[in-house]
Amino acid sequence: MKLVVEHLKKSYDAKEVLRDIDFTFEEGLIYGLLGRNGAGKTTLFNCLNQDQMVQGGRFYLEEEGGTREVKPEEIGYVLSTPTVPEFLTAREFLKFFMEINGQTVPAPESLDVYFDLIQIQAEDRDRLLKDYSHGMKNKMQMLVNLMAKPKILLLDEPLTSLDVVVAEEMKQLLKEQKQGRITIFSTHIMDLALDLCDVIVLLNHGELERVEKESLDQQAFREKILEALRENGE
């Protein structure tokens, strides 16, 4: 399976944010979408998630020798600021999510299977989500997106504000869950992209460029990216 993006364009008034996005993402890989703040990473995600209309180009899935449009339910989108129903307990939230997604989310013998996956402790599973820390809310947001088994998982800087322990847990979870889907992880932190991602893609001046890291040592790789980000910088 491949997600093919062809000549995607998006502008806000006179500001051209996505100039000519042309790239193919492949199943089973984590792509690091690297770019400075304001480069258009969130705009690209909003277009792929069909929250915003594009002004040129298209994107589609290529699988089994054919092509087709991406269905909304095939996309999971994890925001940098977690959005969860704070009036529910964590267990109630999972039950509710499974009820409204019964056709796509398999029912486990116990919800504790899912809590174990993201290392939410037993004493926290029946607490209100409003009492969860930012990191725990982020875990819950990540969990329901993984439960839905989307073909495309968009992660908009989800680890930026997490503490070191939670961030490491989330990185390990993403690596374990990458098979069978296309994962695109946006960040402006170079070391995080290098550590987590299989492929690095640079969003700069409204265009995507794959940066081959296999043939570069760490320092040369950093310098290449920094040089690209400095050119005609905002």
Task: Label every PLM stretch briefly.
Residues 3-5, 18-20, 72:
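Conserved structural motif at the start of ABC-family nucleotide-binding domains
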Residues 34-36:
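The feature captures the beta-strand-to-loop junction immediately N-terminal to the Walker
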Residues 49:
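Helix-to-loop junction immediately C-terminal to a conserved catalytic motif
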Residues 56-73:
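Conserved ABC transporter NBD signature motif
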Residues 153-157:
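Catalytic Walker B motif of ABC-type/P-loop ATPase nucleotide-binding domains
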Residues 164-166:
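Helix N-cap at the start of a conserved alpha-helix in ABC-type nucleotide-binding domains
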Residues 207-230:
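Conserved beta-strand-loop-alpha-helix hinge in the C-terminal portion
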